[in-house]
């Protein structure tokens, strides 16, 4: 039961911190020159606020669960403040919690600038959100090596986290934009269409970064051995995750090369309702697949390739 709870908390942290980083980041490169008529459409302040508060709570729960596991006590109520302090002060994962909390509170502070200085606010939130997201690397396989390989594997994992966070944040942004049906008009649909076009280039960079960093991570975790893919739970989950990633690529390709251009044409013709609905369904499907992948990632971090099943 404790392992299941830990996996759920890890999953929620992955999703939450990726939104905190990816949503304001998307506003920097994906949404610019917003007109007054569509200002509310692109206002993500309430979503980011909720994510930050949730991230602080989840980090606190994660601190308790990990400290409990390290202390060896069977009941969480037996966990002492002394043990928690020791984990925080003497372990890398403990230090990462403090860094994450500082970054999350910084993000919370940057939200106060959102209304009057949105670009500056999003820039600050992207940086602090990126730091918060990066701390997840110290809770998985990225720190299993020593020396130079420690830093190379960590850099690869940070790249993977950043790229995944950028993609997840963009999906959340598009989902929010497309779900606000009562605010859709010619101007708002133009904002969505333009944002899709801007994400096309960023999406290519994200996919390349994900693939390359995934290969490096696998080489480090499995030591270049293909056997764990087929004789361990870790390998089978990784294969399932890879299949889902391919599905995401197909959906993203459909958005970029078919649904996006079609929406652009329909906007010019003034008949965009059907195209918006199709794009909404595609984005939501892609987002659901992304959520399942994050669940797999949270599970993978609790397993080792050497655990044959």
From Swiss-Prot:
InterPro entries: CopC/D, CopD, Cu-R_CopD_dom
GO terms, biological process: copper ion transport
Subcellular location: Cell inner membrane
Membrane topology: Multi-pass membrane protein
Keywords: Cell inner membrane, Cell membrane, Copper, Membrane, Plasmid, Transmembrane, Transmembrane helix
Entry's transmembrane regions: 11-31, 46-66, 93-113, 119-139, 158-178, 202-222, 234-254, 283-303
Listed GO CC annotations: plasma membrane
The organism's place on the tree of life at top rank: Bacteria
Keyword Cell membrane part of the UniProt annotation: yes
Protein purpose: Required for the copper-inducible expression of copper resistance.
Family: Belongs to the CopD family.
Cross-referenced PANTHER family: INNER MEMBRANE PROTEIN YEBZ
Protein's recorded name: Copper resistance protein D
Native source species: Escherichia coli
UniProt gene name: pcoD
């Amino acid at each position: 039961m404790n392992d299941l709870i830990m996996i759920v908390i890890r999953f929620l942290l992955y999703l939450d911190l990726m939104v905190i980083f990816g949503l304001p980041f998307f506003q920097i490169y994906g949404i610019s020159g917003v007109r007054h008529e569509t200002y509310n459409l692109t206002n993500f302040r309430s979503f980011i606020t909720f994510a930050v508060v949730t991230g602080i709570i989840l980090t606190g729960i994660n601190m308790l669960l990990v400290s409990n596991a390290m202390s060896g006590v069977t009941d969480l109520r037996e966990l002492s403040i002394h043990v928690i302090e020791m984990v925080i002060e003497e372990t890398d994962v403990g230090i990462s919690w403090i860094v994450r909390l500082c970054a999350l509170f910084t993000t919370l502070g940057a939200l106060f600038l959102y209304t009057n200085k949105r670009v500056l606010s999003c820039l600050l939130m992207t940086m602090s959100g990126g730091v918060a997201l990066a701390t997840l690397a110290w809770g998985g396989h990225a720190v299993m090596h020593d020396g130079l390989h420690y830093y190379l594997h960590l850099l690869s994992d940070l790249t993977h986290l950043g790229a995944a966070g950028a993609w997840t944040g963009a999906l959340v942004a598009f989902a929010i934009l497309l779900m606000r049906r009562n605010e859709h008009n010619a101007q708002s649909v133009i904002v969505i269409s333009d944002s899709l076009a801007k994400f096309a280039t960023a999406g290519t960079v994200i996919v390349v970064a994900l693939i390359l960093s995934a290969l490096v991570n696998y080489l480090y975790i499995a030591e270049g051995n293909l056997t764990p893919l087929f004789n361990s739970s870790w390998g089978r989950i990784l294969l399932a995750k890879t299949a889902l990633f391919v599905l995401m690529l197909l959906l993203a390709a459909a958005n970029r090369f078919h649904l996006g251009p079609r929406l652009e044409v329909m906007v010019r013709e003034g008949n965009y309702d059907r195209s918006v609905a199709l794009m909404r369904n595609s984005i939501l499907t892609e987002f659901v697949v992304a959520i399942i992948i994050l669940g797999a990632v949270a599970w993978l971090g609790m397993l080792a390739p050497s655990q044959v099943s």
